[in-house]
Design a protein with these regions (language model features):
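Single conserved hydrophobic/aromatic residue that forms the stacking wall/gate
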Residues: 1-7, 11
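Short hydrophobic core segments
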Residues: 12-23, 155
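Flavin (primarily FAD) binding-site architecture
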Residues: 19-35
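Central beta-strand plus flanking loop segment that forms part of the substrate or channel wall
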Residues: 33-65
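Rossmann-like NAD(P)H-binding beta-loop-alpha module
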Residues: 59-80
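Conserved FAD/dinucleotide-binding core of flavoprotein oxidoreductases
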Residues: 76-135, 174, 193, 197-201, ...
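FAD-binding beta-loop-beta segment adjacent to the flavin cofactor pocket
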Residues: 136-167
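Active-site-proximal substrate-binding core of FAD-dependent oxidoreductases
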Residues: 163-169, 181, 185-228
């Protein structure tokens, strides 16, 4: 692997290399292409998520409250939604995620997030408050249909380098950790008992992680029919 990826500048000497670069990992993408790991898989999909932490007025704070929304300010054909978590110490975690497969070339994800905060239900929460931190990151949204083969000679992909994010829940930390645990178990068997690294994928398909991603497999694709039909189908499914 080191000859194909980094040439003579760096020599990686180990039995198994675990790639955990996160969404759009540079080496992970090269490995997927080189070893054709995404053969017969759907193209990977991506989104962008914005998050702000606000310190708000005590009267507007309800510790433990969780809110999720879909739709506005996006139109019915653009995938996206928000999250609002009322944390401790009068803090609110406020965020918005937009799928990067939107069709309108004039759409600005950042500006849509700012518009979202003008909604009366959101404005009343943060009014009089203070934004204390902010950030943005890419999200991997393809789900299990886009998940590549996660093993190859001498290497494994874990977490968002493979694409284990649970998109409907916008949660990927627990899935990344579980994939890392499964990778460690497979590597141990590979070293101790000479088991093939394909064991990693076998363990994955027997785990709660696979079940969780499988259950969420139709949520993102269903929104290709628009917001209303997507919500109805997701509820039925």
């Amino acid at each position: 692997i080191e000859e194909r990826l980094v040439g003579s500048e760096m020599c990686i000497r180990d039995r198994v290399t675990v790639f955990a670069e996160g969404c759009r990992g540079h080496l992970g993408k090269q490995l997927i292409k080189k070893f054709n790991l995404n053969k017969d898989k759907d193209p990977q999909q991506y989104g962008i998520g914005f998050k702000e932490i606000w310190e708000i007025d005590e009267k507007n704070h309800e510790e433990g409250l969780v809110m999720h929304t879909a739709g506005w300010p996006l139109d019915n054909n653009t995938y996206g939604g928000s999250f609002i978590y009322h944390a401790e110490n009068k803090q609110v975690f406020l965020g918005y995620v937009i799928g990067l497969d939107y069709q309108n070339p004039h759409l600005s994800p950042f500006d849509e997030f700012q518009r979202f905060k003008t909604h009366p239900s959101i404005k009343k929460i943060i009014e009089g408050g203070k934004r204390i931190s902010y950030g943005a990151r890419a999200l991997i949204e393809g789900g299990i249909q886009s998940l590549p083969k996660m093993f190859m000679p001498g290497a494994l992909l874990i977490g968002c380098d493979a694409g284990t994010l649970n998109m409907p829940k916008i949660k990927g930390s627990h899935t990344a950790m579980k994939s890392g645990i499964l990778a460690a178990e497979a590597i141990n068997e590979h070293i101790q008992s000479k088991k093939d690294l394909s064991l990693y994928e076998e363990l994955f398909k027997k785990s709660w992680l696979y079940k969780e991603l499988y259950q969420a497999r139709n949520v993102k694709p269903s929104f290709n029919w628009g917001l209303i039909l997507g919500i109805i189908f997701t509820g039925i499914d």
